[in-house]
């Protein structure tokens, strides 16, 4: 049966909130962080084409993730969500994609081994092509142009042609997301994540890392455990040769998201089939805004970034709108306070949600609240602040009687120097050597692995 032939189904959102919802009802709200396309005809043509293209994910994958996130809310799983600040179309090549997957697999191996529980692996890629900006325009040497808003909207080069929003880029974003998803699925189905051979996940350039010995000891321990289990069973354990892997991105460019919001056979309501796990950021989380209106109607698990300016009342009202039936696995709050503010700002939010008996998954984004600029103009993050915010999150949740259920990190499997500190003690002078991000700084492989190890050590302390 074609998607267009699916019969209308009851709208569970309207029943819950008393307000009618459709994939385009967001258009009646204030939509922030949206580009202005100069050619409405070209925009309509691109969206028409996008609507007829196949979805990027499936309904059963989305619902499986929601069930796993519900288990994370109960403390039975831990969420690892990571990837680029903003993907570039040029990064859609095998080496970059496999390295992204490798670093997440290695981090998850550390967490599974140390936390003794399953890890939900979610990539912040295969669709993370839009980026909110603090200003609509950028000025250089007296020339003012539209800000770069991610490859799905415009190009980073500082020219008038590059910065002009181009709706055809949405079609390119769909194609690059599909190629990325296809390659990730092929790697996983082909045994790339096989626990019988975790040594295959190694990144060659880190063979001399200060963390290498500790990690290789862990790999050997897991290999011994697998061998022992198979010896007892008298046969090879085949379900160790693949994993579940999901994607996420910021649902920022609503025309794109709407075009990939579909109904499917034997499922009520609407699903965003561009990603498994959409989120919205602080700049677009207004209760009466277009982005909240859009997210309230899709059946995907969703997440909201929560910053230091959010009040307990705002948080509870967001829950009322986005998860009125307290559905397990539906709603995550990703707090991003910054190491300097988390001790003051997070506890009142935890207390309010707990006191009201609301069901959410708490996730720590230790990146966005710790961004700073160096004297020579680089945006960076200090590793000690990133690690410190993660560790304080565990302490604050333990004190509040709540549970930190995951982390959300901007990272890469490449040998970049964008965040200072870490095992190699990178300094501001090192930033010039391999700073490749077009937007925000990312943890490199070693720093990412070190965060995973810090999570394990901290969890052992607060148990």
Question: What is the predicted role of each segment?
Answer:
Residues 64-66, 288-291, 318, 346-349:
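Glycine-rich, charged/polar anion/phosphate-binding loops
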Residues 315, 324, 330-362, 368-417:
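Non-transmembrane, aqueous-exposed alpha-helical and coiled segments at domain scale
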Residues 413-431:
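Short glycine/proline-rich, acidic loop/turn segments that cap or connect secondary-structure elements
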Residues 86-87, 92-338, 381, 406-408, ...:
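Active-site-facing alpha/beta catalytic cores
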Residues 2-154:
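Long, contiguous, compositionally biased segments that the model treats as domain-scale units
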């Amino acid at each position: 049966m074609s998607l267009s032939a699916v019969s209308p189904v009851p709208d569970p959102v309207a029943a819950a909130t008393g307000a009618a919802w459709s994939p385009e009802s967001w258009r009646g709200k204030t939509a922030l962080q949206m580009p202005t396309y100069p050619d409405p005809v070209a925009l309509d043509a691109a969206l028409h084409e996008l609507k007829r293209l196949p979805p990027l994910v499936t309904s059963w994958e989305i619902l499986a993730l929601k069930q796993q996130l519900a288990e994370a809310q109960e403390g039975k799983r831990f969420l690892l969500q990571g990837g680029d600040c903003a993907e570039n179309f040029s990064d859609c090549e095998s080496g970059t994609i496999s390295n992204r997957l490798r670093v997440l697999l290695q981090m998850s191996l550390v967490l599974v081994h140390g936390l003794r529980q399953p890890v939900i692996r979610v990539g912040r890629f295969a669709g993370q092509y839009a980026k909110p900006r603090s200003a609509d325009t950028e000025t250089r040497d007296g020339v003012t142009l539209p800000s770069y808003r991610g490859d799905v909207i415009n190009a980073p080069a500082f020219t008038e042609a590059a910065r002009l929003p181009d709706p055809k880029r949405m079609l390119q974003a769909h194609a690059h997301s599909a190629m990325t998803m296809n390659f990730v699925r092929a790697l996983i189905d082909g045994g790339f994540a096989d626990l019988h051979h975790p040594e295959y996940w190694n990144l060659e350039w880190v063979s001399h890392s200060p963390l290498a010995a500790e990690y290789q000891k862990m790999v050997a321990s897991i290999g011994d455990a697998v061998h022992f289990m198979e010896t007892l069973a008298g046969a090879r354990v085949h379900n160790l040769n693949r994993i579940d892997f999901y994607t996420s991105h910021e649902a920022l460019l609503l025309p794109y998201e709407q075009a990939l919001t579909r109904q499917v056979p034997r499922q009520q309501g609407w699903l965003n089939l561009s990603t498994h796990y959409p989120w919205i950021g602080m700049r677009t989380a207004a209760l009466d805004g277009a982005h909240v209106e859009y997210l309230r109607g899709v059946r995907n698990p969703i997440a909201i970034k929560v910053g230091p300016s959010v009040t307990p009342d705002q948080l509870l009202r967001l829950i009322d709108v986005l998860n009125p039936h307290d559905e397990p696995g539906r709603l995550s709050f990703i707090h991003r306070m910054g190491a300097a503010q988390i001790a003051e700002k997070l506890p009142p939010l935890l207390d309010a949600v707990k006191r009201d008996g609301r069901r959410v998954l708490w996730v720590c984004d230790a990146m966005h609240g710790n961004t700073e600029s160096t004297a020579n103009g680089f945006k960076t993050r200090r590793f000690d602040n990133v690690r410190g915010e993660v560790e304080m999150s565990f302490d604050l949740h333990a004190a509040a009687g709540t549970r930190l259920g995951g982390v959300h990190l901007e990272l890469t499997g490449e040998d970049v120097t964008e965040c200072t500190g870490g095992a190699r003690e990178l300094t501001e002078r090192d930033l010039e050597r391999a700073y490749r991000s077009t937007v925000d700084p990312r943890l490199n492989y070693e720093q990412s692995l070190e965060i995973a190890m810090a999570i394990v050590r901290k969890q052992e302390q607060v148990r």
